[in-house]
């Protein structure tokens, strides 16, 4: 099996001598799209994420790309798969909230699922298809469609139609009857006044063992993670929230991260490698630099889309959430903070003609 390098070995292989303008150069004007990061060592990660990590590790919720006219760009969606394999992640998740899910049509969702199933065929990453819908019947229909594509896992946020945990039970048990594949329960609270109780999750996982995968994001999130980790019914517990608390969540025992982070996938991969090497100093340092960028995204709407375009992952920065024109001051701030991550940035693969 290909050797797994520690974070320190990886950085050494990447030639961690030059820091600063040699990587990113001067801040570009609005609309610039290419970046010249460091070369990627061939042996950064083992060849089979599914076999080695066993549904552990980094599961990236793919962002949804759009053409200049606002149509879903299926070519860029497929290219994102190539980028994420190159970056060293373990799983692909789509479509969820970070994918612009509420703004996608049924036809776009189904065609996007088909696109990703084809693009990921023969690759080492696990494919996780999001099948949540507002009501149980619609969710079951989408889950049956997804099942035919043979993903490695499905994920579902709870329903928006209903009034009690009994409605949640009907929803998730119905999904469990559609597939025998692992199902990730995302604990986003969708029904006002309905608490997604951990005991309820344990009951579901006891009855349907393939429901024992949890993306935990309900408050109090740290207490809930602690209540789930190590329980015999629970197969995996995943961190969320853009990785904002990932370092602490790792200490609590989570099995990975599920979040929208395509623009930082290589950096989170470096953080995961440091964790696997038990190098908590590097975990802290990488996470601290990531937090600066995550804060920058909160301060500057549109920064995430800018970075997807800036790094060459997407061909446009188009969004369906309203167009944002960044000022040069905002671009300068994004670029300044991005330089803090340069030791971990990998080159985005060239697009095939």
List each language-model region with its residue ranges:
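N-terminal export signals
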Residues: 2-4, 9-32
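C-terminal segment of N-terminal export signals and the immediately downstream linker at the start
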Residues: 25-61, 67, 71
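Conserved residues at the C-terminal ends of beta-strands
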Residues: 61, 95, 157, 217, ...
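A general structural signal for well-ordered alpha-helical segments in protein cores
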Residues: 77, 109, 113, 139, ...
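Short helix-capping segments at alpha-helix termini
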Residues: 119-125, 149-150, 179-181, 206-210, ...
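Catalytic alpha/beta core domains of metabolic enzymes, predominantly
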Residues: 190-288
């Amino acid at each position: 099996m290909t050797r797994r390098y520690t974070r320190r070995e990886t950085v050494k292989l990447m030639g961690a001598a030059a820091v600063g303008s040699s990587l990113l150069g001067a801040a570009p004007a609005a609309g610039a799209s290419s970046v010249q990061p460091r070369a990627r060592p061939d042996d950064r990660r083992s060849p089979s994420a599914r076999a080695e990590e066993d549904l552990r590790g980094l599961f990236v919720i793919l962002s949804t790309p759009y053409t200049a006219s606002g149509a879903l760009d299926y070519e860029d969606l497929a290219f994102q798969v190539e980028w994420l394999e190159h970056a060293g992640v373990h799983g692909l998740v789509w479509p969820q909230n970070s994918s612009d899910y509420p703004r996608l049509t049924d036809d776009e969702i189904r065609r996007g699922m088909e696109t990703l199933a084809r693009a990921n065929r023969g690759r080492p990453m696990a494919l996780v298809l999001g099948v949540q819908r507002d009501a149980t019947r619609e969710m079951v229909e989408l889950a049956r469609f997804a099942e035919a594509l043979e993903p490695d896992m499905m994920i579902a946020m709870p329903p928006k139609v209903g009034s009690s945990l009994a409605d949640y039970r009907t929803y998730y048990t119905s999904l469990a009857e559609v597939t025998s594949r692992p199902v990730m329960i995302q604990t986003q609270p969708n029904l006002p006044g309905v608490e997604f109780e951990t005991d309820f999750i344990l009951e579901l996982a006891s009855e349907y063992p393939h429901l024992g995968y949890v993306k935990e994001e309900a408050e109090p999130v740290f207490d809930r993670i602690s209540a789930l980790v190590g329980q015999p019914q629970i197969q995996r517990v995943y961190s969320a929230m853009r990785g904002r608390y990932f370092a602490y969540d790792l200490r609590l025992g989570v099995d990975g991260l599920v979040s929208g982070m395509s623009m930082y996938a290589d950096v989170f991969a470096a953080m995961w490698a440091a964790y696997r090497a038990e190098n908590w100093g590097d975990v802290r340092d990488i996470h601290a630099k990531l937090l600066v960028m995550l804060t920058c995204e909160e301060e500057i709407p549109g920064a995430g889309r800018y970075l997807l375009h800036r790094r060459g992952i997407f061909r446009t920065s188009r969004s369906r959430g309203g167009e944002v024109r960044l000022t040069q001051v905002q671009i300068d701030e994004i670029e300044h903070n991005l330089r803090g991550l340069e030791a971990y940035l990998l080159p985005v693969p060239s697009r095939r003609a």
